[in-house]
Amino acid sequence: MGRQLKSGKGATPRLSSVVMVYYKGMLTNGKVFDDNTRQSYPDAMRLKDLIVGWHIALQKMKVGDKWITYIPSKFGYGSRALKGIPKNSTLIFEIELCGIA
């Protein structure tokens, strides 16, 4: 589902965790639909509120890891189209896990 770009040594989040992440979301054609990597601080999000693909990937990551992960539509938004994301899209995310609350 993905590969590690940078290795961390911190804790691994649980589904109930709040994670602090930098991320960039792209379609398979390279179009970026979301990107917070230029912010001065990572976003804090409750893991259980995110798409299933993020549940799977982040529960395998350690704080300090950076991954690129490929999320099939069934673990993303499925048949729902969102702004900038067509229905049934495979999603590509670069995710850096910066912390766990």
PLM regions and their residue ranges:
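Cross-family detector of peptidyl-prolyl cis-trans isomerase
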Residues: 1-101
